[in-house]
């Protein structure tokens, strides 16, 4: 019964994995809000099949000042925790008059292969600088302009997205089926070994009990009173 249950679980897992491997994955879209000290909305539209990501930073004019003049973005992309790409995406300028939006397009490794992959992309806002015009008067009464710089630093990370295999063929199915059969053979061998061991223990226990009973019987037969009764019966 236990073995049949195990086979049923393995079969269900096989069907589930095959369904995952042949599922078509559309562009993954998600939005998030940056950390509070950044005070800006960040929205991202990512297509993990083509390896393109577009990020829009919507600046808060009250926090950032009149003009947002510089935003420097850094991106780190992790592929299965073994491959990392670090690149500076853009140094863009924007103005409140055009909506304080900075569009950044990034690239990361295209999803390939037969296995499900985890891709984690994080965007780090290195600096968001603002300049404001301030009228000052010198001792001579001449008006000058200064541009004090305000820098805001924050870290924003996207969610970890699990990307399923996107393929028109079943190249990975054969390899997975071989691995599945190998695991199944190992499990069957292990369960068979354990079952044989248990059966052997039961046989040895039964043999020991019978041998003990046999020894007790012969000990009982060898007692003097038993022998005398047997001799009396023989004489009669």
Curated annotation (Swiss-Prot):
Keywords: Glycoprotein, Membrane, Signal, Transmembrane, Transmembrane helix. Glycans are attached at residues 67, 80, 103. One of its GO terms (cellular component) is membrane. The chain crosses the membrane at residues 184-204. It is a single-pass membrane protein. It is found in: Membrane. The keyword Transmembrane applies. Residues 1-17 form the signal peptide. Its main location: membrane. It comes from the Viruses. This is Glycoprotein U23. It comes from Human herpesvirus 6A (strain Uganda-1102). The lineage of its organism: Viruses, Duplodnaviria, Heunggongvirae, Peploviricota, Herviviricetes. The gene is U23.
């Amino acid at each position: 019964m236990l073995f049949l249950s195990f086979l049923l679980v393995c079969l269900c897992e096989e069907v589930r994995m095959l369904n995952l491997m042949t599922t078509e994955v559309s562009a993954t879209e998600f939005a998030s809000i940056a950390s509070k000290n950044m005070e800006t909305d960040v929205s991202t539209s990512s297509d993990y099949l083509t390896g393109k990501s577009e990020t829009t930073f919507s600046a808060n004019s009250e926090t950032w000042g009149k003009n947002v003049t510089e935003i420097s973005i850094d991106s780190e992309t992790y592929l299965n925790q073994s491959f990392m790409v670090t690149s500076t995406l853009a140094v863009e300028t924007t103005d409140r008059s055009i909506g304080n939006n900075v569009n950044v397009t990034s690239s990361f490794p295209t999803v390939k292969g037969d296995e499900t992959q985890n891709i984690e992309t994080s965007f780090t806002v290195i600096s968001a600088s603002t300049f404001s015009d301030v009228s000052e008067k010198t001792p001579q009464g001449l008006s000058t302009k200064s541009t004090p710089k305000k820098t805001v630093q924050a870290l924003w990370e996207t969610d970890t997205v699990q990307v399923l295999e996107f393929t028109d063929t079943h190249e990975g199915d054969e390899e997975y089926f071989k691995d599945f059969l190998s695991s199944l053979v190992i499990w069957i061998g292990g369960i068979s070994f354990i079952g044989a061991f248990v059966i052997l223990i039961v046989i040895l226990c039964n043999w020991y009990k019978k041998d003990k009973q046999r020894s007790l019987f012969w000990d009982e037969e060898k007692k003097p009173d038993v022998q005398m009764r047997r001799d009396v019966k023989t004489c009669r």
